[in-house]
Amino acid sequence: MKFFTVLLFASLAATSLAAVPGSKDELHLRTQPTDAIPASQFTPSSHISKESTSSKDLSKESFIFNEELVSEDNVGTESTKPQSQEAQDGLRSGSSQQEETTSAATSEGKLTMLSQAVQKELGKVIEGFISGVEDIISGASGTVRP
């Protein structure tokens, strides 16, 4: 029982740390809009009304969907941080590179501190849950079933 409890809390900790709430330098994925794909490609091969179908017919019925897959080449990343014209042209001076390095280090430091704070709080919560479960289990071991 303790093993499953610890396993549950470990998975909770892993998922909560994976979803640390936003920073200013978030990355967003950009994909092709779904409006570019014709609706005819998503139309099932046959149409049957609800009244004329039974559960047997549904198991035999096959639907064919044609989908256009988006390749990884069409997916790009886009920073929400605005870029100057110099950065877009690839002409960066030493001072602008220093500023970008400093801002990246600052946001990494903030992210690290936030992650450590979340880990500490989560550790406290897990310890509380484990002690509560241990109390329940130890209290239940003294009871006798009729």
Swiss-Prot record:
<dbReference type="GO" id="GO:0007155">
    <property type="term" value="P:cell adhesion"/>
</dbReference>
<feature type="modified residue" description="Phosphoserine">
    <location>
        <position position="54"/>
    </location>
</feature>
<feature type="modified residue" description="Phosphoserine">
    <location>
        <position position="71"/>
    </location>
</feature>
<feature type="modified residue" description="Phosphoserine">
    <location>
        <position position="59"/>
    </location>
</feature>
<feature type="compositionally biased region" description="Polar residues">
    <location>
        <begin position="74"/>
        <end position="106"/>
    </location>
</feature>
<keyword id="KW-0597">Phosphoprotein</keyword>
<comment type="function">
    <text>Adhesion molecule that accomplishes cell binding by presenting carbohydrate(s) to the lectin domain of L-selectin.</text>
</comment>
<feature type="region of interest" description="Disordered">
    <location>
        <begin position="25"/>
        <end position="112"/>
    </location>
</feature>
<feature type="signal peptide">
    <location>
        <begin position="1"/>
        <end position="19"/>
    </location>
</feature>
<dbReference type="InterPro" id="IPR007906">
    <property type="entry name" value="GLYCAM-1"/>
</dbReference>
<dbReference type="GO" id="GO:0005886">
    <property type="term" value="C:plasma membrane"/>
</dbReference>
<keyword id="KW-0732">Signal</keyword>
<feature type="compositionally biased region" description="Basic and acidic residues">
    <location>
        <begin position="48"/>
        <end position="60"/>
    </location>
</feature>
<comment type="similarity">
    <text>Belongs to the PP3/GlyCAM-1 family.</text>
</comment>
<keyword id="KW-0325">Glycoprotein</keyword>
<keyword id="KW-0472">Membrane</keyword>
<keyword id="KW-0130">Cell adhesion</keyword>
<keyword id="KW-1003">Cell membrane</keyword>
<dbReference type="Pfam" id="PF05242">
    <property type="entry name" value="GLYCAM-1"/>
</dbReference>
<protein>
    <recommendedName>
        <fullName>Glycosylation-dependent cell adhesion molecule 1</fullName>
    </recommendedName>
</protein>
